[in-house]
Amino acid sequence: REQRRMAGAEALKAIRARTGTAQSAAPAKKVDGKLYKDVKTNCKKVVALACSTGGPKSLQQVIPMLPRNLDAGVVLVQHMPAGFTASLAQRLDEMSDVQVKEAEDGDIIRRGHVYIAPGGKHLRIVKNGSGHKIQLSDEPAIEGLRPCANIMYESLERCDYDEITCVVLTGMGADGTKGIKGLSDRHKKIYVIAQDEDTSVVYGMPKAIAQTGLVNEVVPLNRVAEVITKNVGVS
């Protein structure tokens, strides 16, 4: 037991040290939306993002850099306990041109809006007439995770988006990989962006999806917002 405790302490120390070095990359810049005006117009698009360890700080280099008129809604799963995601959403909203909120059951997914899965809830995206909405549930945790990114991605199998931009940022483990692979297996049109190893606090989740061969672009943290915008455009 003592050996496990010491090993855990060493792992935590390594993550803390890595947090400092990973975030020392050049800061991200706000994306100039005018550069991406005529990108994939007249189609339904969504951005589905997953992150874990190191995610809250990394999201500050992504969400506030997105243009206000991003031509897609953004739904994201950040592994956090209940009670913490509301303050994360508020902080990001204050920093951003896009509107950011903690997701509520029944929220209609709108362009230029970001919805963060509440800690302690699973989040699904479901069809709602000609659009889509958010559905939350208290189902049991999956491999210790609630919210779980795989649940979010798997729900998109039953949606009618023309393209799904999947983004995987820093995090321990492999959450998101199974769900994204499922989208590919069902011939959904996906575009996959993964954070690179150098800027990841923990290169677990991005590595797992990269190893599937499904990733379209591997980019440093300071380019994630630009690549998202380049792929979905602005309205």
Which ranges hold each PLM region?
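Strand-loop microenvironment adjacent to phosphate/nucleotide-handling motifs in alpha/beta enzyme folds
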Residues: 1-235
